Amino acid sequence: MSFPDSYSPDPARYDGRMPYRRCGRSGLDLPAISLGLWQNFGGADVFETGRAILRRAFDRGVTHFDLANNYGPPYGSAEANFGRVLAADFKAHRDELVVSTKAGWDMWPGPYGDVGGSRKYLIASCDQSLQRMGLDYVDIFYSHRVDPRTPLDETMGALAHLHRQGKALYVGISSYSPELTRQAEAMLRAEGVPLLIHQPSYSLLNRWIERELLGTLDELGVGCIAFSPLAQGMLTAKYLGGIPADARAGKEGSLRREFLSDANLARIRGLDAIARRRGQSLAQMAIAWVLRDPRVTSALIGARSVAQLDDSLGALEGLAFADEELREIDAFAQEGDLDLWEGSAKLGSADLPQPRLGARGV
């Protein structure tokens, strides 16, 4: 697949099909559906396929693209490929885009690029990400996870430093517990930097944020962008008949074969039946369900083809749920024991080194 050098986005991209939601108590709106580049945009993938997906997303009103330093594979290649598309297709539209990236998981060899939240790692990683994407700044820079070996005030201090430098217009956190979210928000506020957004995992089979986190974010005025609303692809038609040979669960990766237990498959089939009665695909209903709560600013999806992207964006045509539908969904939308990120999200202040004496916001 090849494309002409010039690209003109669809002039109807802001015609109202894509709703935009205010992110917490900030001045920033995000599209109800954002596109993440965790999978399918790395150096091992077909560049022109990813380019077509990005173009189609923007044509459909998706203005927020989410990355991380180690997205690929190989690490860094998703940012590099996104930078190529930015330069070739989106350069004239940079001010229409919200670009985010993150750091916190392992990235480069040695003690300074491993899992971490140190000042050295976060600032170096942000600089590297900007270079790979060919940008002077990102709109949002995240601490991708809690680092149990680094005091929280050091991690938040690094985010505040990047914000003051103008390298990050906003800052966020991902997979933080409600307790640490409160502490992170207070530390940043003491530095004069608002915490814009939290990015937790959330789906019909992974509902941990409903217990306390959503209420905490609402109270603090922090936005929420839910990643993996399709439970790494489980909440699609792909697994209704078992595990296909080409499925992500059949390979090494984020979707483990044991997640597709008999109990989870029964839940998926039950949810699919409800989706069919609603006139939606299972994926569309799963995304719409995440967005049913106004405290969720955006659902962060992935896509491996333009057709898959279009199907997911079709969720916007059926966001309303009757009370009876929600009760029926609740019978199947139960914890599936598939939260890969709970190791970070369960950490509390007692699990971290104590802040330095005199740390602000403590």
Which residues are covered by each model-predicted region?
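Terminal-tail/helix-coil boundary detector
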Residues: 2-18, 243, 247-273, 277, ...
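Glycine/proline-rich, positively charged
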Residues: 59, 106-208, 212, 223
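Conserved, mostly hydrophobic/aromatic
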Residues: 23, 35, 50, 57, ...
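Aromatic-lined glycan-binding groove of carbohydrate-active enzymes
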Residues: 208-247, 281
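Short, well-ordered coil/turn segments that N-cap beta-strands
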Residues: 28-33, 61-63, 91-97, 135-139, ...
